[in-house]
Amino acid sequence: MKIIYKDGHVDECPQDQELHVIRHTAAHVMAQAIKRLYPEADFAFGPATENGFYYDVDLGDTKLTDEDLANIEKEMHKITKENLAIKPFILPRAEAVKLMEERHENYKVEHMADLADETEFSFFQQGEYVDMCI
């Protein structure tokens, strides 16, 4: 399995990290699916974990139903079939904040403010979806 690192280089993924990479990518696909179905969604964190992955997302007053979850899963399958390239890029702080503000990612902007020592931030883009990765 190949992996794209934050600096853009591609290399073989160490076997002991493969599951983590798959889960991290799945979190991005899920977030992209949610954003397509709920454009107002504001994402906080979405890490891979030891047992899977999750994403904290603010949907305002929207409460997800079982049907909504099934629709998110269908959209995830659709995104996977699109075989979108994953493109890493790094931005200096000011540009990173501007990008997240333009995309209405308020929790990401807030998180960047908490990381005062960071001068640049890593992002991954797949199709129309862009996610910040710390």
Where would I find each of the regions flagged by the language model?
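Auxiliary tRNA-acceptor-end handling modules of aminoacyl-tRNA synthetases
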Residues: M1-I22, M30-A33, D42-A48, Y54-I134
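TRNA-recognition modules of translation machinery and tRNA-sensing kinases, especially anticodon-binding
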Residues: T25
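Metal-associated gating/positioning segment near the N- to mid-region
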Residues: R36
